Amino acid sequence: MSKYLRTSHPSPLICRPILTFSSLHILTAFLISGNSSYINWSVTIILLILGLYACHRFLNMKKLTRDAQEPLLPHIRPSTRNKIRKYIYGTIFILSIFLLYRSLNSPDTSKHGIGRNGDFIEYEPKAGPTIKEPVENIVKLDVYMEAQCPDTSRFFRQQLKKAWDILGRLNRIELNVIPFGKARCTEKGNDFECQCQHGPTECQINQLMNCVIDRFGFPHRYLPGVLCMQGKYSLDEAMKCVTENYPSEYERMRECASGTRGRRLLALSGQKTASLTPAIDFIPWIVINGSRNSDALYDLTQNVCEAMQPMPSACKDYLRSLQ
């Protein structure tokens, strides 16, 4: 008589390959690609569940009786069952680690989704309409002038000072004052010899203005002194403006205005003046944003305001006052 009966239960050969394949797939994906396709993960987990089910059924088979005529499966020894249980427990442990890892590193569902192939896709947030703040432009204002020119003196008193008082604090004007006018400078070795339209005294005051501008650089520092010097008829009178505005710089400015440095600075202003297109034919020559503006001679504030975009409230108030 046969010792064992035929059975329809799965063979133990099915358990180990399924468990091994599923475990290795999960372990590899866990180490290499945490964002593997969800479809692939689903297939792997289904195979793992089938393997666990098959092994469970195999371990719970009843011992076959000795009356079987066509034995197929041997009696399962306790040692064999223990080995298969190790496979099951190991697989469950790996699966638990994987699920814990995925739960801790899952992407933000509010910003991600699953594409057709099962991979993560990132949604681009739809931003509402944005209102762009207008960019405030800087107005470049260049004034080409000379110290004893009556038209320049009038422009300084009536237009430049007023415009700077109203708009200078806005930090939207790039002001450059170039004292030279219709002078001429000739290079003599390491020095220059200059002739000015209104005589040698004008050259000295022009040189003093250039020294002050070169020394302080910023309009809010040099402009009070230059406004004071404009129209003076002697260097000594112009130096009083240095005493009033820059008392600690008196000796330095006097030496600069009467020496080689002052003449060199005047010659540099002459180069800037000579580069203008078209060439100057009137002093003061006013340039706003690279273009000569003759109307600015009569209302500098209005013309600078019209060049400012957007127009500040100080300009709006000034323009209303003209009506």
Swiss-Prot record:
Output the Gene Ontology terms for molecular function: oxidoreductase activity; oxidoreductase activity, acting on a sulfur group of donors, disulfide as acceptor
Transmembrane stretches, start-end:
13-32, 37-59, 87-104
Q: Which UniProt keywords apply?
A: Glycoprotein, Membrane, Transmembrane, Transmembrane helix
Give one Pfam family, short name only: GILT
Positions of glycan attachment: N35, N289
Q: How does it sit in the membrane?
A: Multi-pass membrane protein
Q: Where in the cell is it found?
A: Membrane
Is Transmembrane there in the keyword field?
yes
Q: Which Gene Ontology CC terms are recorded?
A: membrane
The record's comment on protein family reads: Belongs to the GILT family.
Q: Which PANTHER family match?
A: GAMMA-INTERFERON INDUCIBLE LYSOSOMAL THIOL REDUCTASE GILT, GILT-LIKE PROTEIN C02D5.2
The name this protein goes by in its record = GILT-like protein C02D5.2
Q: Which organism is it from?
A: Caenorhabditis elegans
